[in-house]
Each structure stands twice: as C-alpha cells, then as structure tokens.
Design a protein with these regions (language model features):
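Short, well-ordered coil↔helix boundary/capping segments
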Residues: 65, 69, 93-96, 182-183, ...
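Membrane-interface transmembrane-helix boundary segments in multi-pass integral membrane proteins
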Residues: 103-117, 178, 182-185, 417-425
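Secondary-structure junction/capping motif
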Residues: 92, 160-188, 241, 280, ...
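Membrane-interface segments at or immediately adjacent to transmembrane helices
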Residues: 152-233
Length: 507
C-alpha cells in the first residue's frame, strides 16, 4: 500500500484544479457575465485536469506547482472573460501577435496587471522544471506529441472535436461558452494551424499580376491634363455620435455644432468599419488599400509582409509626397513596417511630436493637428503634391481628460463610459473643426476625408448600447440592423471648395 503522503500528493492536482476552476468560473460569471455552460464543464475540467497532471509531473516543488497552475488557469479563464466583455469575443491564436502592442499601450497598474502574470508564469516554469521521475518523461512526451500533432496534423485534433462539439464561424463567444476555455483553446489552436495559408508560387503570382495589369492598362483611357490635388485623410479614434444612445440622458449634444452642421451637409454619411472597440489597424488597411479584412486578426501584424499597391504607393508613384502621423510608439500594430510597405515615405510617430498637451498618456488632437500643420507647411506652400494621413491618439478608453478640458456634458446613464465618452467627443469634434478651418485656409482645394475607425467601448457586454436598445448583450443575438449599427461610424469627404459630398454609407 502506498504511503499516505504519496496518495495525497497524487490527489493534489484534482483538488487544486477543482478549486481554481470554481474560483475563476465565479469571477468570470459574476464580474464579467461570462458563464461557461454547465454541459461544457465536465469535459473542459477533464482537459484542465490533464494539463494539471502534466504540469505536476514536471514540477520540482508542490507550492510552486499550485501557484503556477493558479496563474495559468486565471490567465486562461479570466483573460478570456475580459476580452469577451470588452470586444465581444474570446482570445484567438492570432492575439499572440498583438500581445506586444497591448503591452506597449498599457501604462501604470494596467501594464502591471497584464505583464506581471505572464512574467511570473515564465519565471516559475523555468524555476520549477524537473525531469527527475519517470512521470516527468511521460508528461514531456505528451506535450511534444500534442505539439507535433497540433502543428503538422491539426485535422487529427480538429475534425473529431468539430464533429462532437460543433463550431460556429460567426459566433466565437458561443463557441467559448459551449466548450469552456481549455477545450476552446485546443480547438481553435488546431484550427489556426489547419487554416494556415500556403503562399502562392512567386513566379505564378508575378505572371498573374502582369497579365492583370496588361489587361487593365489596355482598357484605360488617358486622363488628359491632370492637376494633382493634396489629399488629407484623418482617422478619428473611436469617433461616433453619442446621441444615438437615446437612454443616455445627455443634457446637451456632445458633438460640436459646427461638426454637426458639416456632417448634415454630407447627408450624415457613414463608413462601415471591420472592427469594434479596437483593432484600428484593420480599419486603416481597408481605407488605405481597398481590400476587406476577412480574418479575425490584426492585418498589420503578420499578414502584410511585402510591398502592396495601396493608395500611398500609387500616389507616390505619381509624384506625391506621402506622410503618416500617429503620436504613439512606432512599433504599435507593427505600423513602422506596415506603413512603409503600403507606400508611406515618412512616418512621424511619438518621438516626432512635442508632448505638450496630454490627456494622461494621449496627446491631444489639438496639439497633434497643430504640429502636423507646422510640418506640412513647407510642401503645401511649395505646391508639392501631398498625401497627408493622420491617425489621432486621443479618444482611447477610458476617455481621460486633463485639467484644461473640464467636463461639459452630463448623463443620467449608470454606465460610467457614457458620460466620459461624451465629454471626450465634445473636445474631439471641436478641435477637429478648428483644425479643418486652419487646413482649408492654407489648402482650400484639397480633398479631405474624416472618419471614425470604430464604435467606442461603452461598458462590459455592450452595456450602454443595451441600455438604449440599439444592441443586444451578445453578438449571437444581433439583428441585421444591429450589425449595421455595430459597424457604422461618421464619414465626411470634402471636395475642396465644392464642399462635402453626400456619399451615403461606404463599406
């Protein structure tokens, strides 16, 4: 009969897994309203238990094993709940590539809360790893075989899981809730490798492109005398019309009267964004390159590896100077490489701007606009054709304002973001109109495009939108009209002295 201590040690993963599973289930459901379906718990718990025994077999010290298991389980279950409550969907394999950008944008306790668990997991794994017992070699074999299968034969894992548990391509939240975090991670990890794209043969691709260009050139007619006009595109972070929240209880219109009047002249046109609450880079890609983003990942991070015939490239080939401005760190969303591959000759980022008017870590729009106007004054005055692309930084959650920008708008909503966002929009729209007045005075015949990149985050599980009845709390319950609402942001296109165009809704 084995000693009592040995029996207790062997049972430890069962007890610890049950306790951690229950703890993080309660946190996810009570704090974030993300509750895994009861029918999914047994199999998900079993997978989590297998992970626990593998970790247990490779551990030198029991207390470190328990701490490490708690951190891993917390990141897996609470991390998914946080992402679902903010963005409507769980963590996807491609989010690994966005992790660097997330850590770069976080500051203070937000950075510590995100980075500390990851650093602790890595350190504890190295500190506690051992191969002293036969069970450790068995656990290592399981890890290696699972990894090899996942990468080289993902269908062997994915197909039986899809048959038994199903898969909803359009509703990842439901996939998560009906599988549980561990099964979901395994299933979507296998799908990531199964769906990996095989790059086309280079010679075939070049031949196809040459044929396409030859046919296209043969069908075009001469443009005749072409007088280049400057083009200014301004992407407005989280820019949207708060008055669409009818239950917000605003005491006044958050949008500046001048902006409201200009947007009315444009027929209240809208752009349809591929993202909600974040992932600005995908909205940028669609605007600058004219191709849709069809996968749930950040296009700039690892899918823009070569030079692309996007608008900046085309204009540069026709004598334009192409400039991009965004007062964030240059590597965020891999912009430093993506902008170059799209054809921008110059990228002004954080180090190129004076941080003289900050709303917490975000440079104000007023300062950004003023500094960009100063930078482009020379080429505009010399008559050099210019493509000037600006991505604002101010407007990110949780919508901070400095002392020079006191709150002007009140709201009766119980969702904190409803009031803070409205005040942010008050200043964003007013500062935009001041910039527009100055820009048109200097460059009256320019083509100017203004658009919001996505709707703002307004409480967990779309709470502010749910409060006003414009969205459901889950994407799986959205109607067609709700989906349209979910992606629609203001857009204004100004044709020089001819004024704003009534474009309708643009996708």
């Amino acid at each position: 009969m084995p000693p009592l201590n040995t029996v207790l040690r062997t049972l430890l993963p069962i007890v610890s897994t049950a306790l951690f599973y229950a703890l993080f289930y309660l946190i996810s459901s009570l704090q974030f309203d993300v509750a895994i379906k009861p029918a999914a718990i047994p199999f998900d718990y079993l997978l989590q238990l297998i992970v626990a025994y593998v970790l247990f077999a490779l551990s030198r010290r029991l207390w470190v094993f328990v701490l490490l298991q708690g951190l891993l389980t917390g990141v897996l279950y609470v991390g998914n709940a946080v992402k679902i409550s903010f963005f409507g969907g769980p963590i996807m394999p491609d989010d690994v590539y966005a992790l660097r950008s997330l850590l770069l944008v976080l500051e203070g306790w937000h950075f510590i809360a995100a980075a500390a668990p990851l650093a602790a997991i890595a350190a504890l794994l190295l500190f506690n790893f051992t191969l002293r017992h036969w069970s450790a070699y068995l656990a290592s074999t399981i890890v290696i075989l699972t990894g090899i299968t996942l990468v080289y034969e993902p269908g062997a894992i994915l197909q039986p899981l899809d048959r038994h548990f199903g898969n909803s391509v359009w509703d990842q939240r439901s996939n998560y809730l009906y599988r549980g975090a561990t099964l979901y991670t395994l299933q979507e990890g296998a799908r990531y490798f199964a769906d990996a794209h095989t790059p086309p043969d280079r010679d075939l691709a070049l031949s196809a492109a040459a044929n396409l260009l030859e046919n296209a050139m043969g069908n075009t007619t001469s443009a005749g005398n072409f007088t280049p006009r400057n083009v200014h595109i301004v992407l407005l972070e989280s820019f949207w019309d708060p008055t669409l929240l009818e239950e917000a209880g605003y005491d006044r219109d958050p949008l500046a009267p001048a902006f409201r009047a200009l947007w009315k002249q444009a027929g209240y046109s809208h752009a349809m964004s591929p993202v909600f609450g974040g992932y600005t880079a995908n909205a940028e890609f669609e605007v600058l390159c004219g191709f849709p983003v069809v996968e749930d990942n950040v296009k700039f991070e690892r899918q823009l590896l070569n030079d692309a015939p996007c608008l900046p490239h085309l204009l540069a080939e026709n004598g334009y100077r192409t400039l991009a401005s965004h007062p964030n760190v240059p590597v965020f969303w891999n912009r430093i490489n993506a902008y170059r591959r799209m054809g921008f000759q110059t990228y002004w980022s954080k180090q190129d701007f004076l941080r003289d008017d900050m709303n917490r870590e975000f440079l104000s729009d007023a300062s950004l606009y003023r500094q960009v106007l100063e930078k482009i004054a020379d080429p505009v005055d010399r008559g050099q054709p210019l493509f000037n692309y600006i991505v604002t930084y101010f407007g990110h959650w949780n919508y901070p304002l400095n002392d020079a920008r006191p709150n002007r708008i009140t709201a009766s909503s119980s969702v904190d973001e409803v009031s803070s966002y409205a005040n942010t929009m008050y200043y964003k729209s007013a500062e935009l109109m001041t910039f527009l007045e100055n820009l048109q005075a200097r460059d009256p015949d320019a083509i100017i495009v203004l658009f919001g990149d996505h709707l703002p985050f307004m409480g967990e599980n779309y709470s502010a939108y749910v409060e006003s009845g414009v969205l459901a709390s889950k994407r799986s319950d959205f109607s067609a009209d709700m989906y349209r609402f979910y992606v629609s942001t203001p857009v204004i296109i100004i044709d020089g002295t001819r004024g704003p165009l009534k474009t309708g809704d643009l996708a």
